[in-house]
Amino acid sequence: MADQNFLNEVSDRRTFAIISHPDAGKTTITEKLLLLGQLIQTAGSVKGRKGDKHATSDWMAMEKQRGISITSSVMQFPYKDRIVNLLDTPGHEDFSEDTYRTLTAVDSVLMIIDGAKGVEDRTIKLMDVCRLRDTPILTFINKMDRDIRDPIELLDEVEEVLKIAAAPITWPIGMSDFFKGVYNLYTDTIHVFVRGRGHTLMDDIRIEGLQSNEAKELLGDDWESYVDEIELVRGASHEFDHDAYLRGELTPVFFGTALSNFGVREMLDGFVEWAPAPIDRETNSRKVEAKEEKFSGFIFKIQANMDPKHRDRIAFMRVCSGTYSRGMKMRHCRIGKDIKVTDAVSFTAGDREGVEEAFSGDIIGLHNHGTIQIGDTFTEGEDLKFTGIPHFAPELFRRVRLKDPMKMKALQKGLQQLSEEGSTQLFMPQRNNELIVGAVGQLQYEVVAYRLKDEYKVECIYEAVNVNSARWVECDDAKKFEEFKNKCRDNLAIDGGGHLTYLAPTRVNLMMAEEKWPQVRFHSTREH
């Protein structure tokens, strides 16, 4: 029987990620959540108050320059007797693979929608990922103090485009310059909006009862029409159903303005009450329950140079069961080796501290000296492999050349380490000594060039290369596979993880190779 203190620790955990289209307000909301969790005293917007303050969660130099989240950082804070683990995901579409893997490490998701723009394409793609896993989703419609679209229209769009039932919990009173607050349909409470920059925690000004004299005074001549609007909303929208939310079929919806720190508290209150505690996880041999006492976890991300002073790499681990305690022994299942871990760390946006213990649902960082890969499983001895952590074939390819040929070793090391993070992939063709970098989008090339220069002191040049697509190859017939490798040597490369890859110059070439070698399997994704 598991220890009651341990069971309480697990059931108090809430581990989630935020998804949104770029510029919908994700970084601002992240900051306000940290403010509510009292991790920071004042919030600075991404662009900086008086130009001096960057968002706490955007801690890499290039992110500070561009104002988009490129890497996922992890923040833990206490709130209302719960321990909240927030994973910030990259806010740019070129980093979708990193985001996808981050979503495998959480139990629920907060979706931010820009009230002026509605559902945008990046949100649609991220929702598709959440739907694969039936992830529970809570929605915050942002920017109510601006000119926004009709709220009923926004709810309809969420339902039609994202194929999920929407249940409003709060409802806006006015919008833009006439925004007065939100009304909670379940507690019959008005939360009054006070204009100002939400850099600090505001008092929660409430009016109890839509029929109260205070409510009539706040709404003035609009009171009757607002009462009618609420009746219409109640009649036309879904009621909140907790089980449907946990199944990923219904999303509770909150309205507010993150910049002014309004509506975020109500949303967080709902989140800690309704979001699931750590869920059970599938492995290649059995389901691992979050409340099992034996420790297990998997690596969903690797980040190089989180601290340029230490030139290190950190592997981010989701704890799936049991307790991590400092100095414990754990089995690195892929290589079958037992290691003693004394220096695991936790993060708040670049500030790292040692972890004494961590429980199911927590995210910890392990120092990685090149032996840990994305998808690796760690246990207290049992041989397991957590499943469902994918690697996608890249869509763009560039040859990398050095400005200074003497720095080849540093270039190779830099590209190898950056590819281990999983947002770009390195390919080394068998026919020559070229280095080819594959990516999902153009921004990743800029990031790699910037980080090579900033962290490895290497300047590189990209050149066009005759590669259209990459496929991982495998074959059960050893003799046939040898024949394939000899005949197709000019198209074969080894990727950064040591896997054999077929680089096709055209789509037609790939189709012909697949026809000619039916025994060989060509994969566009592979499990880590």
UniProtKB/Swiss-Prot annotation:
The keyword Nucleotide-binding applies. One of its GO terms (cellular component) is cytosol. Its main location: cytoplasm. Increases the formation of ribosomal termination complexes and stimulates activities of RF-1 and RF-2. It binds guanine nucleotides and has strong preference for UGA stop codons. It may interact directly with the ribosome. The stimulation of RF-1 and RF-2 is significantly reduced by GTP and GDP, but not by GMP. GTP binds at residues 20-27, 88-92, 142-145. One of its GO terms (biological process) is regulation of translational termination. Residues 11-279 form the tr-type G domain. Belongs to the TRAFAC class translation factor GTPase superfamily. Classic translation factor GTPase family. PrfC subfamily. GO terms for molecular function: GTP binding; GTPase activity; guanosine tetraphosphate binding; translation release factor activity, codon nonspecific; translation release factor activity, codon specific. InterPro entries: EF-G-like_DII, EFG_III/V, G_TR_CS, P-loop_NTPase, PrfC, RF3_C, RF3_dom_3_sf, RF3_GTP-bd. It is found in: Cytoplasm. This is Peptide chain release factor 3. Keywords: Cytoplasm, GTP-binding, Nucleotide-binding, Protein biosynthesis.
